[in-house]
Amino acid sequence: RLSVDIEVEFDPGRFPDPKLAEKRVTAIGLKGTDDFDQIFVLKTEGTDKGNNELNDNIKVTFYDLDKEKEMIADAFKIIEEFPFIVTYNGDEFDLPYLYNRAERLGISNDNNPLYMMRDSATLKHGVHIDLYRTLSNRSFQIYAFSQSYTDFSLNSVSKALLGKEKIDYGLDFDKLSLYQTANYCYNDAQLTYELTSFNSDLLMNLLVIIARIGRMPIDDIARMGVSQWIRSLLYYEHRKRNSLIPKREELQKRTEGVMSDAVIKDKKYRGGLVVEPKEGIHFKVVVMDFASLYPSIIK
């Protein structure tokens, strides 16, 4: 897999619009498996190179100001080599910006590995996992990571799960040297990658296991909640039994006019049966309660 992070020129107080992609891409950070570490940086007018703070194994390539198209094309060639691309908020920014900027610069669609959908970005021949959407999923936040983070920014999540943070030079981004820009961008790509690799690839293993159980593509698992996982599994079981799956409107029509008489005074429906608990310590306890309050308390 390969993590991707980009940096873009911007006017003070205005965030670049990925749909318009009017500003130059100034850096592309790439961190992949098998010790793949590379960063592309666009030279900008009046910006010094500065000092290289990166490790020797990280390859830094500088492009002249008029070579942005070549820089993006080179990044696309690398992206095509990996079956999994990992980003942080890549659905909303990084990949749409690269896609639209490439189109704006005249890179043909045949040479663009990205594919835009209505509310997400993916690859023509691969899987894109947006960790922002994955880690803001309460199923992962609460059950997998014990709510160790409450804010979903890359900095907050990385600090909680990895004990690492984004780089802060204390300068406006347009005041950074080229090597500082490279270090900043690569560090974001590295944090994104390590969120999938820490604790023996815990998150990637979880995604694969849930995809197998829920019979869903792994990129859908990474973006959808537990109710969709269960629905997909039920669809699979229905099809395996050659059973028809009713449409939602058919279910609604079926229940029209159905009324339930109260069985308990002043209540419309009978509540669940409450069993008096036996005091003491209990082992081999199993809880089956989806997205509810009580399993969280028990945990």
Which residue stretches match the model-derived regions?
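Acidic beta-strand-to-loop metal/phosphate-binding motif
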Residues: P83-D91
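Residues immediately flanking
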Residues: V4-I6, G90, L131, M288-F290
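Short, glycine-/Ser/Thr-/acidic-enriched flexible segments
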Residues: E7-E9, D35, T134, G280, ...
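Active-site-proximal helix-loop-helix substrate-binding element of RNase H-like nuclease domains
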Residues: D37-L42, G46-D66, I85, L95, ...
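Short active-site loop/helix that positions an aromatic residue
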Residues: D94-R104, A291-K299
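Common nucleic-acid-contacting/processivity interface regions adjacent to the catalytic cores
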Residues: D172-K299
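Conserved RNase H-like, two-metal-ion catalytic cores of nucleic-acid enzymes
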Residues: R1-F84, Y99, E249, D261, ...
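Structured core elements
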Residues: S3, V86, H128, V274, ...
